[in-house]
């Protein structure tokens, strides 16, 4: 087992990474303040891991909520189902919520924890590659609005993150590739040595080589923890983690939540961001080709859906948390291994990317 730390003073917490961690109840119980625990999961994860999770909570007053699977259910209605379960069991402020699932469950359960009785502790138990390397770390919690992804949320840190890599054994291939998009992103935005390693080892990751996966998860979490420690609430460097996300969120919203997985949409968005960075003269054709090629090798889509034209993209991109005073701002690439903070860009060049890249 590897143990990393997110350094946020009194609100700092450990990230545990390793195989078989769900079978070590002492790990999770050490971070529970009281005797009441609600496990929030979904209908895909529950048959695989809910009983094991509840066994790790033996001796506690436990309950569970099993929600429908998918981004389309990351809603206020689903959050209300969590609140209903907490209230039905008369759980108080010393109760804890355990998020057992991927990014949707982690975001939703964390949001519910931030809101219930003005905040109760929660623990992240991510079961997908994407959630283990990205969404479970850093305290971003949210639900979606029909007009925009993650528009209703809060910064609220977990008590710990428990990443049992055994759960990746049951992860569908498509979900594994979607998680690799966020792994690869760290190489693009700040870690060129990791990028070179990924270019040499992406096939090992697709084959689920345990050593390669363990290294990629650890290196990704180190990058994420360092960024969060420097900028918890995204007023500076944390915004670079949004490379490809403005384009990607437009795809997710425009196509309907769940049609494209988050990692798939981000992969396309990173290619669009690379194309726009080239048009601005910051990177060259060779760098754009490296971006596209690595994502293709990770079995990710690299061209935008034909159903979304430039005007549709711009309409959805106008609803983005990085925008300032109604003006669009994007995270782009200065080089492979260095991202910009959100910047305003020439409208003509942006439209050229939206109209020409992948069309």
UniProtKB/Swiss-Prot annotation:
Binds 1 divalent metal cation per subunit. Can use either Co(2+) or Zn(2+). Belongs to the sugar phosphate cyclases superfamily. Dehydroquinate synthase family. Its EC number is 4.2.3.4. One of its GO terms (molecular function) is nucleotide binding. It catalyses: 7-phospho-2-dehydro-3-deoxy-D-arabino-heptonate = 3-dehydroquinate + phosphate. One of its GO terms (biological process) is amino acid biosynthetic process. This is 3-dehydroquinate synthase. Keywords: Amino-acid biosynthesis, Aromatic amino acid biosynthesis, Cobalt, Cytoplasm, Lyase, Metal-binding, NAD, Nucleotide-binding, Zinc. Pathway: Metabolic intermediate biosynthesis; chorismate biosynthesis; chorismate from D-erythrose 4-phosphate and phosphoenolpyruvate: step 2/7. It is found in: Cytoplasm. The keyword Amino-acid biosynthesis applies. Catalyzes the conversion of 3-deoxy-D-arabino-heptulosonate 7-phosphate (DAHP) to dehydroquinate (DHQ). Zn(2+) binds at residues 182, 245, 262. Its cofactor is Co(2+); Zn(2+); NAD(+). The keyword Transmembrane helix does not apply. Pfam families: DHQ_synthase, DHQS_C. It comes from Methylococcus capsulatus (strain ATCC 33009 / NCIMB 11132 / Bath). GO terms for cellular component: cytoplasm.
